Amino acid sequence: QTSRASYSDRWVVLEGEGEGHGDFRTADRAIRYLRDNKDKPFFLAVGFVKPHSPPSAPKRFYDLWDVDSIPLPPNFAPRPTVPEGFPKAAIRPRNADLFMGRDASETEAREMIRAYLASTAWMDWNTGRVLAELDKLGLREKTIVVFWGDHGYQLGERGKWSKAGSLFEQGTRTPLIFIVPGVTPAGKRSPRVVEAIDIYPTLAELCGLAPPVGVEGRSLAPLLKEPDAEWDRPAFTVWSEDGRTFHGVGVRTERWRYTEFGVNGVNGSMLFDLNADPHELKNLADDPQHADVQKELSVQVRKYAARISAAGPATNP
């Protein structure tokens, strides 16, 4: 019997263009759907598994990178490590995916990072196959396209791998791209902080629909038209081990990331100035020079935690 650790702690080189993998077939099904529904309104959600572990891609995508030239993150560690000045609760002591229960050497880390990059590039290629079909069918100029990832990915920062077990930028920031014909300026980026729950009300507004009462989130339509438009909402992230209680709750503004562990930060807190410290190397929590910032963000975190606690545990429909 193969253990989860031995199964996950590897990467896969797919044969050919990856035709035997589910993600390739997902793109094929999406293409068939577009062909079958090109003459009527449609909604199509295309979900690719990769680059979830084990990272997988055809050989030519691995060959895009020289493994010896791949840089390690500035805070790389062989195994999950709580840096000095950080609360112990900030990092789960065991990886849940890659390098489970053992150290990752620098060579192994570079090889795994290359595999992740290759897997991401292959996912991008499969996405391109679907978009190319939109062009072929003449649908691009009347189709809204949203590219979104549901979580970030740690690649050896503080010894962490994959998505879970911390609330740092690397694991919580996600890609989000909107293409709205006649609305979005090509190639523009917005510095505003938004949340995944904003996607649904955005699509509803763009389609001229009223979102159901009680739907959380806020339409991003103003930012799609003007990426630098005023925006006063931060993003929140929750770490829960059981789906009922909070291990940690964090808030992200354009400049700051602040996290409290345990009820009202009883197990410690973290504050980072992401403008000056994008890799989150120095914890500014409890620094007197940043007391006002921490106090303001702590109020936001605790209000958010109280609100979602009152709402009860999240459940899948």
Regions found by a protein language model. Give the residues of each.
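C-terminal cap/loop subdomain of S1 sulfatases and analogous C-terminal strand-loop tails that border
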Residues: 27, 151-157, 184, 195-200, ...
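A generic structural signal for nonpolar/aromatic side chains embedded in well-ordered alpha-helices
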Residues: 46, 65, 223-224, 251, ...
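Active-site-proximal cap/lid insertion segments
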Residues: 1-28, 32-193, 206-214, 260-265, ...
